[in-house]
Amino acid sequence: MSKEIALPLESGKKKIGSTYLKLTKPKVVALMLITAVVGMSLAPVVDFPWLQAAFGLVGIGLMAGSAAAFNHLIDRRIDARMARTHKRPLPSGDTNPISVAIFSTALGVIGFVLLYALVNPLTAWMTFLSLLGYAVVYTMYLKRATPQNIVIAGIAGAMPPLLGWTAVTGELHAHAWLLVMIIFIWTPPHFWAIAIHRVEDYRKVDIPMLPVTHGIEYTKTSILLYTILLTLVCILPVLVGMVGSVYLFSSLLLNAGFMYHAWKLKLSPEQNSAMETFKFSIYHLLALFVALLADHYLGLFFTP
């Protein structure tokens, strides 16, 4: 009898854990933390503060998860009406708004205290501003106010490399802002691709994404132009001496792939082209930052 009781309890605990993990958008947070690691690694520190860096990643991750959970909370009504999001924890009834509010607040507070006390105040406040930028400025206002929502608010999601840099140095640096700029320029074509794929969803809930307000063809052209701009921006770390030929070759190859998908999206009538572009953009950013990391450490290894 005790085993029969224990099994449902264990299953229930796993479901609760899975529900709250989904609220934090773990795949998105993981990608953000990878870019933060790159920021930490490229920062010019003589004696790398490993423990401080570890606490930095935990704190940044907790606050990013908090922002994601707040996004779920604020968007729960429109999520319930969209095909892409109606199975999220709140619309599906797996949890309730009060629990999510408590959970997201707790994550944010713990993350902030951790960063402030064990890393440095600058990183704590910069991460807090990023949280506000995404959870409040973007989700509560810009998303519903302008088709340039993701362009303006993209800075919030682009901050992790800078946060990683400040976590180990305690200061802002122009090179860190270059890494931010890469993600900032990458963000619009990434989101506009999924917006094209889900344009009817956004139209149904009156969210003024670019393909809703300006049309799909205009959005396709914008994606292509942004990928060209991204290619140019990605060269800047080489020009300022941050990284070398390994990154340059990788960057040109990856951006050629992104431009190919954007060009194909512009010219192709295929229905799945937008989703293919969206998926490629994720692999593109991941590979780009891995290339930054590889170039940096290969340079250290082979430098006499």
Swiss-Prot record:
It is found in: Cell inner membrane. One of its GO terms (molecular function) is protoheme IX farnesyltransferase activity. CDD domains: PT_UbiA_Cox10. Pathway: Porphyrin-containing compound metabolism; heme O biosynthesis; heme O from protoheme: step 1/1. It holds the Pfam family UbiA. It catalyses: heme b + (2E,6E)-farnesyl diphosphate + H2O = Fe(II)-heme o + diphosphate. GO terms for cellular component: plasma membrane. GO terms for biological process: heme O biosynthetic process. It comes from the Bacteria. Its main location: membrane. The keyword Magnesium does not apply. Its EC number is 2.5.1.141. It is a multi-pass membrane protein. The chain crosses the membrane at residues 28-48, 50-70, 98-118, 122-142, 150-170, 176-196, 223-243, 245-265, 282-302. PANTHER family: 4-HYDROXYBENZOATE SOLANESYLTRANSFERASE, PROTOHEME IX FARNESYLTRANSFERASE, MITOCHONDRIAL. Carbon 2 of the heme B porphyrin ring is defined according to the Fischer nomenclature. Converts heme B (protoheme IX) to heme O by substitution of the vinyl group on carbon 2 of heme B porphyrin ring with a hydroxyethyl farnesyl side group. This is Protoheme IX farnesyltransferase 2. It comes from Vibrio campbellii (strain ATCC BAA-1116).
